[in-house]
Amino acid sequence: MGVSLEWFGDIARRLGITRPALYSYFADREDLQFRCYEDACQALERGLERAFAHHPGDMAGAVEEFLASRPEDGEQAVICELAALRDPQREEITARLGRMADRLSAALAAGIAAGTLRPMDCDIVASAIIGAASYAPLLRRWGGGLDSGLIAIGSVELIRRGMAADRRAEVETFRPLAPLSTPRPDAFDRAGLEQAKRERILVVASAMFNRRGVGATRLEDVGEALGMNKRAIYYYVGGKQTLVDACVERAYRYFLDVMHAAEGLTAPRCAVVHAAIKDVTSAAVDPGVSIILPYVGYGLLSEAAKASVADSARAMYDGYRDMIQQGVAEGSIRPLPVEAVTVSLPSLMSWSPIQIFTPETIALCAQELADLALWGILAR
């Protein structure tokens, strides 16, 4: 559901205790979220320490152990709603994540200097590794029955060596497969103007939901960011439930449009999957067209929207699985565990919405994550 939506009363009922009893352990919802994020940081830090200790000087081996490890204390929270924390708490969690990313980035840079790893943007790849290590609980929430246990296998395959069969070959590039832009109607086109305003609301709301979570984002917050009041949002879109459903429907329509466009290309499947990853990542991090990521807001969707998400998630899995299988058959993708890799593809960008990107770094992030899926970190 997301930390911001897990009200104290719901948690207390699940634990079989009273709500006042829960208040004896945590001051409020934000305190509970912070403590959960602290535990998650500790689990990631321990896993990273073990991986480096077991593989001194072997960054690829350390990354493999880090991604394949399981938390010792059960499922941890996924740190994906940082903006919902109070400022001091957010700064502390951000600093801890930053230190882990810095350590991974430095180790990646050392591997590049030693010639064991390929050139890459070490900061982006380090963040992607941390995101992939946290992805399994997210998939269990929204994946429509997909096997989250395959994440450790698939993420190791992708991040260590990537999908490409020929690691020396360059990959074909394409125009955006399914361009996503805010419409610019004629000034006298009333229906077009209303549609453009609705689209702009969905873009801004999606970006805020990605960064803050749905529960911590009010309609008033969205309106303030747009310079309009809550009544205008009701007029163009509807209430919060309708807004969340509309953001998710827009995202999945885009995901499926990209996939279908990729399926129709007459090009090696490795290049096609590379292009699709690049486009979806760019849309997720570009504030001008922002799409809500699959796992965000799932707990607040209507039952009809949840069913639609499950169907879309399964359709996306089937489509990308088939493209990867075709790539293996044609020889552009190496033999690999297709199901595990397909399930793991979204994990590479699961961290990205909590970052702030400039126009220059949007393209760099999209390119780096697509390259990571194709070639991994090992030297080419």
Tell where the protein language model's regions lie, with residue ranges.
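Generic hydrophobic, amphipathic alpha-helix propensity
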Residues: M1, I11, C36-A40, L44, ...
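Hydrophobic alpha-helical connector segments
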Residues: R35, R46-E75, V125, I129, ...
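C-terminal peripheral helix-coil segments that are non-catalytic and often amphipathic
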Residues: D102, A106-A113, L138, W142-V203, ...
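Amphipathic alpha-helical packing segments from all-alpha helical-bundle domains
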Residues: P88-A114, D123-S127, S134, A304-E330, ...
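Helix-turn-helix
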Residues: M1-D31, R200, V204, M208-T242, ...
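DNA major-groove recognition helix of helix-turn-helix
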Residues: F26, Y37, A133, V237, ...
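Amphipathic alpha-helical segments used for helix-helix packing
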Residues: G61-E64, A68-E91, S105, A284-A304, ...
